[in-house]
Amino acid sequence: MKIKEQFFFKQEASKNKIHFISLGCSRNLVDTEVMLGILLKSGYEATESLEEADYLILNTCAFLKAARDESTDYLQRIIKAKKETAKIILTGCMVSKHKEELKPLLPHIHYVLGSGDVEHILSAIESKEYGEKISSKSYLEMGEIPRKLSTPKHYAYLKIAEGCRKRCAFCIIPTIKGALRSKPLDQIIKEFRLLLKMGVKEIILIAQDLGDYGKDFSADRKSCLDKVLKEMLKEPGDYWIRMLYLYPDEVDDTIIDLMESDHRLLPYVDIPLQHINNRVLKKMLRTTSKEQILDLLTKLRTRIPHIYIRSSFIVGFPGETDDEFQDLVDFVREGWIDNLGIFSYSQEEGSVAADMPDQVSQSVKSKRLKILSQAQKQNVEKHNQKLVGQVVEAVIDGYHPDSELLLTARFYGQAPEVDPCIIVNEARLVSGFGERYLIEITGYVGYDLIGRVVKKAPGE
């Protein structure tokens, strides 16, 4: 799992300096941005320096044990590096269900907030005594909320729901995040318009499962995602809307129709499949079969031939046999999936699968992870070869992390943070980040493409 650190905005000296570290997924990042906005609006100032901060807020991740270990490591680093008078506020998924793993470090914590309880960040910071408030309250239930974006100015995440209705055997997210809570449609559209007004050109919709949106309040318990998309697409402008985390049983003809008819709803979907063997899928408590998955992927690629499909798979699920794993390898080699995240099964306490017999050894899981990763890499190389010589419209994200002589860009088939990018090595025509250009693909290295800027994209 990719765990990232987000630091925010250095401003002038103040006795009320705050420093945020946000770990885990983009949904966590949105919560961090809201907390940051609340504090900035209240007169606090943000600093990039951990050592200078008066208040340090760590938003933890608990998706897997590796994520919890990373959260603990960051907390230890903060405790050692902070100045003596600084206070630490701990929040996020880990404190809601795995606080016992933090017990040795709790004496160093000034305040503990439950996952998503962003509303109380101000009271936590201003509390004169050590405190704790573990609740499932989400900012989705609040009214007007400030938010300070930490992403590059041209893209932002828009969370439309919190919690999860699914009960997959390997997952503990429902016990951490609670039941599905959909954000009111009018609030979503208000935030969408505000992001556009701020100059955001790519809005990435996120939830535990976008397709579950509205099932907690609609009379027929059906998804209302199509209503959200239709309302958004009424807004004028040449923006991009990208969908992440859409379960396979929630991708219906209405969603496909919208992608087909309006280029602003990008032909890109992130569909977590997790496996392809029917016995394993059943043990995982997934609601789709291999046959249904193949039918869906065939429909998507028939209706929208240029679509990009992202997915995730788990190797080494309890009881997974060599033959069942080979089914997964064969499926990946068929090239159905463009961008893929692969995880070794993690035995998470509290999940159904944690108590299953026939747990797969770590050595076998590591071997299977390597085999499946290699199969996908071969697919990507074949696909990248076909792209060489083509010209794509792409947005310039910024400098490449390895060198300011290079830039990074993305076309519609590449989501930020999770997918490969285009490495731009000829960019004399670029006048600003966040703008779209026509880029000729000249080669590739690993998963990433290499390209040169031809000219500005039409409309820029």
Curated annotation (Swiss-Prot):
Keywords: 4Fe-4S, Cytoplasm, Iron, Iron-sulfur, Metal-binding, S-adenosyl-L-methionine, Transferase
Free-text comment on the cofactor: Binds 2 [4Fe-4S] clusters. One cluster is coordinated with 3 cysteines and an exchangeable S-adenosyl-L-methionine.
Catalytic activity: L-aspartate(89)-[ribosomal protein uS12]-hydrogen + (sulfur carrier)-SH + AH2 + 2 S-adenosyl-L-methionine = 3-methylsulfanyl-L-aspartate(89)-[ribosomal protein uS12]-hydrogen + (sulfur carrier)-H + 5'-deoxyadenosine + L-methionine + A + S-adenosyl-L-homocysteine + 2 H(+)
S-S bonds: none
Signal peptide (residue range): none
Stretches assigned to the TRAM domain: 385-455
EC number: 2.8.4.4
Binding site for [4Fe-4S] cluster 1: 25, 61, 93
Domain of life where this protein originates: Bacteria
Domain MTTase N-terminal positions: 16-130
Enzyme class: transferase
Needed co-factor(s): [4Fe-4S] cluster
Span of domain Radical SAM core: 150-382
GO molecular function terms noted in the UniProt entry: 4 iron, 4 sulfur cluster binding; aspartic acid methylthiotransferase activity; metal ion binding; protein methylthiotransferase activity
GO biological process: tRNA modification
Family to which the UniProt record says this protein belongs: Belongs to the methylthiotransferase family. RimO subfamily.
Purpose: Catalyzes the methylthiolation of an aspartic acid residue of ribosomal protein uS12.
Protein name: Ribosomal protein uS12 methylthiotransferase RimO
Organism this protein belongs to: Chlamydia felis (strain Fe/C-56)
